[in-house]
Structure formats: C-alpha cells, structure tokens
Amino acid sequence: MNYSDFIYDFNLYLCERFGYRNCCSVMHNANGICVSVHVGEMDLYIRFWEYSCGVGSIPDWSIIIVRSNFKRNQQENLKDLARFFKEYAPRYGYKYLCTEDDDYKYYQTLGLKLIHRGFFRQYNYGLPLKELDI
C-alpha cells in the first residue's frame, strides 16, 4: 500500500486541528506503518497495521492507538482523533480501531470492547470503525 496520501491527510488533520505542520514521523515495517507525533501538546504513537496475523487478537487492517496524550482536553481530542479515523481510514482500507495494553483507559473514552485478555493485565480493546459511536 502507498501510505503517502493517508499520511498527507493525517498531517493535514493535525495542522487544521492543532496548528502543527508536517509533524508525523513515519516508520515502515512488515505489518504496515507506525506514526509518532511528539510536538507541543501532543504525544501520539499509532500503528497502522495491514496484517496482524492474530497477534493480541487484533484484526487485520487495524489502527492501533498505543499512546495518545494531549496536555489539554484529553478526552475531547481523543474522540476527535477517532472521528477523523472513522471518516478517513476506510478510504485506505482500514476497518478497525484498537488500543494495545490500554493502561490509559482510552477504550472507556471511545467505547471499545475487550478483544484480548493477556497475561499481566495486558488487555487489548477494539471495534469496527463503522460501529464507533462518538
């Protein structure tokens, strides 16, 4: 998959919403890409997986929020980020929104359901994007 258009849309969203231009750091891997944003009020780390091979019960074509910290309005900004993904991600083939080892309780803010209960309280949550009610 060519990720440049999706990253362009994501960068545009971050610029329009928060005023930061071209702030995504993108790392390609065998499963898809990982995006980091560490600027101003934001600390984001998000995986965009095409293939999960069932790891952590995360489905293929998932957006996995690993870290999403905003200094102000945490819940509002997280919901807005999820709304962006719900609208734009299906255009690029993504079908699910998930969290990984969710100590920050993002799943409560987004209404995600438990999909994997691992050892040592490692819980993953997820939901199809079309079922996301935010």
Residue ranges with predicted function:
Residues M1-N73, R83-I134:
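Non-catalytic substrate-recognition and accessory regions of acyl/acetyltransferase enzymes
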